[in-house]
């Protein structure tokens, strides 16, 4: 069977695209072309609605706290209430002047580092008052979801999204244009769970483009829950209905609220936002998120959405259920904590703590789409736990080469950290100070971001542990005939007698150090690994090319060694129902198979297909369901997300 598959896997039809199938620019150009020719208001673009999906796994994210990044327009810093601004930058609870012009000014710095998407803290208009001495510089105390925070745009600029819908002449619109000109994406942080705390006798005053529509203290329309603070964090009802730190908590059962929040976020998407990061998702029921994400995908099918389930973990059934059934992926807190414990804190288990997380990937439908990180704005920075730049390099290499979508917290590349009070909030949000493009971590991120875009094994492939001790960790990423071998050392210099790489025999050059390594019989012998050293060896195989590429992901199928999942159907690309010519998928983990299927002859046509399990020496096991049907897009990239329908022995 493998012999039958081999020609089909490598002799794909000629490409209509550029040679570099994996460049972010290709996907961006496709999206731009669609945006430039939208359907009329009365026309529904059914092809776009049912055949497009965003591919975000090749991105390198960079998370920015807007107020603490760069002040590109000092004239707007005082804002409506000068009391909320500290020009000395000594009061950590007040605004320090960062704005959207500052981000525009530094886009070339970010682009050069290999950043392909920036995640910004919320840009909505905030309350202009102090709560326990703190201003809403973080963006999570919203007053009006349909207006831009005036502190982030130029003085006198219209903050209303409605009033600038036609002109699109705000600093925010210029940021979108500058990003897209550089083939970069914008991730907008949004908050659906709450509005604002009690300040000066007011709480939860909410506006719809300047018109007051809700008030926690005068809530006849029941826009808010009124159950007080969460007392028991193990009680799901309390977590979803009670207050978090005194914040007015929305009542998701109120259809007026749901219509308002969805219409607001759609306006931001219409202005060019590419992806959404959703705050505090564990504090609202999953049915709300299913409705919300469904509406967002119907409005903008190529939007990518991920949520913050604080301290999610693969052993936490509720967070796993959310990741699998909410319509969005999540931030991978489980891996983050394991990396911090193993590398920053040096816990005895070391890399075994990290492998324990990867061993649970089968619990997720989309483990390769989890957002990975080593720190953020809600915890001490990695370097506040361990200031050794060499161990930071190991941690960055890990998240940039292992499964998931890596996210770098602003300033990490410049070793930015303030260790006051252990680096806890608010000291984990210092002002960005340096812009050194020769910083070692800056250069590391640039190299590894390029690797992620060039080598599909790193962004989409399976991950296989090849060597592990508490101090040394080796793994292989594999997709089709592309490979990446990674070896990390958190400890002293060590010589490894032999380690399997799966690379072809011959000399290979480390992406990071340019050191040479000889592979024989797929292994490296007597490998010397320096103290806190890293080795990254890459081999890029033949790329999948076609007029339309379908990225098919199948979950829920249990296979044994030697069994292969294939896609069969009524078109030549899928073998015309001949199981011997069906298209083979790639094993990702025990819950996920994946394939990129090129379509040329059938592009733009309706096809039928189903999945089958090829078993050596036994009859194939086909799904027990009516054939799936799909209209293949005429060109570009499509994603199928399917769940195996248990087969029936014939």
Residue ranges of model-derived segments:
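Structural recognition of the beta-strand scaffold that forms the well-ordered cores
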Residues: 61-65, 117-122, 141-147, 186-189, ...
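Carbohydrate-interacting/catalytic domains
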Residues: 1-65, 71, 78-81, 96, ...
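Substrate-binding/active-site clefts of carbohydrate-active enzymes
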Residues: 47, 54-59, 67-271, 291-309, ...
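Active-site-proximal helices and loops of the catalytic beta/alpha 8
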Residues: 16-20, 43-45, 176, 180-184, ...
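Short, flexible loop/turn elements at secondary-structure junctions
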Residues: 65-68, 124, 149-152, 192-194, ...
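Aromatic-rich carbohydrate-binding modules that target alpha-glucans
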Residues: 557-606, 614-634
């Amino acid at each position: 069977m493998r012999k039958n598959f081999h020609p089909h896997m490598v002799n794909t039809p000629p490409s209509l695209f550029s040679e570099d199938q994996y460049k972010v620019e290709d996907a961006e150009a496709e999206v731009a072309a669609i945006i430039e020719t939208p359907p009329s208001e009365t026309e529904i673009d059914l092809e776009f609605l049912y055949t497009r999906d965003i591919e975000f796994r090749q991105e390198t994210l960079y998370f920015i706290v807007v107020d603490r990044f760069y002040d590109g327009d000092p004239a707007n810093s005082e804002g409506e209430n000068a009391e909320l601004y500290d020009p000395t930058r000594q009061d950590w609870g007040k605004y320090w002047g960062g704005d959207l012009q500052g981000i525009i000014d530094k886009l070339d710095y970010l682009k050069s580092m290999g950043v392909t998407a920036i995640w910004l803290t919320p840009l909505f208009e905030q309350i202009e008052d102090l709560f326990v001495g703190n201003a809403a510089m973080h963006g999570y105390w919203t007053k009006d979801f349909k207006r831009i925070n005036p502190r982030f745009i130029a003085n006198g600029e219209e903050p209303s999204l409605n009033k600038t819908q036609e002109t699109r002449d705000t600093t925010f619109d210029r940021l979108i244009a500058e990003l897209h000109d550089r083939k970069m994406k914008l991730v907008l942080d949004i908050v659906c769970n709450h509005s604002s705390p009690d300040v000066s006798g007011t709480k939860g005053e909410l506006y719809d483009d300047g018109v007051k529509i809700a008030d926690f203290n005068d809530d006849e329309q029941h826009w808010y829950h009124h159950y007080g603070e969460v007392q028991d964090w193990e009680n799901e009802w309390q977590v979803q209905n009670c207050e978090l730190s005194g914040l007015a908590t929305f009542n998701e059962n109120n259809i007026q609220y749901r219509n308002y929040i969805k219409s607001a976020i759609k306006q931001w998407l219409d202005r060019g936002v590419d992806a959404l990061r959703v705050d505090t998702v564990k504090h609202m029921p999953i049915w709300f998120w299913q409705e919300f994400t469904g509406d967002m995908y119907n409005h903008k099918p190529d939007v990518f959405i991920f949520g913050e389930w604080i301290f999610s973990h693969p052993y936490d059934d509720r967070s796993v259920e959310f990741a699998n059934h909410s319509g969005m992926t999540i931030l991978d807190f489980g891996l983050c904590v394991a990396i911090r414990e193993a590398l920053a804190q040096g816990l005895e288990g070391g890399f075994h703590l990290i492998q324990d997380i990867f061993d649970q990937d089968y619990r997720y439908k989309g483990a390769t789409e989890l957002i990975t990180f080593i720190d953020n704005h809600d915890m001490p920075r990695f370097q506040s736990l361990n200031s050794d730049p060499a161990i930071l390099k190991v941690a960055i290499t890990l998240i940039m080469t292992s499964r998931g979508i890596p996210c770098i917290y602003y300033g990490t590349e410049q070793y930015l950290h303030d260790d006051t009070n252990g680096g806890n909030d608010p000291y984990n949000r210092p002002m960005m100070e340096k812009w050194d493009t020769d910083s070692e971590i800056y250069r590391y991120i640039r190299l590894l971001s390029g690797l992620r875009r060039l080598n599909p094994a790193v962004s989409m492939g399976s991950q296989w542990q090849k060597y592990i001790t508490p101090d040394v960790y080796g793994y292989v990423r594999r997709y089709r005939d592309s490979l990446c071998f990674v070896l990390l050392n958190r400890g002293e210099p060590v010589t490894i007698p032999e380690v399997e790489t799966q690379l072809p025999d011959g000399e290979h050059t480390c992406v990071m150090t340019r050191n040479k390594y000889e592979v024989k019989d797929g292994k490296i012998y007597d490998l010397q690994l320096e103290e806190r050293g890293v080795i990254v060896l890459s081999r890029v195989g033949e790329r999948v090319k076609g007029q339309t590429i379908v990225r098919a992901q199948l979950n829920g199928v249990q296979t044994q060694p030697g069994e292969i999942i294939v896609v069969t159907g009524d078109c030549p690309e899928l073998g015309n129902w001949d199981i011997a010519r069906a298209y083979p998928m790639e094993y990702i983990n025990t819950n996920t198979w994946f394939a990129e299927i090129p379509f040329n002859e059938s592009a733009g046509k309706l096809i039928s297909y189903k999945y089958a399990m090829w078993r050596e020496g036994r009859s194939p096991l086909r799904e027990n369901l009516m054939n799936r049907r799909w209209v293949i897009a005429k060109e570009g990239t499509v994603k199928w997300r399917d769940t195996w329908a248990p087969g029936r022995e014939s």
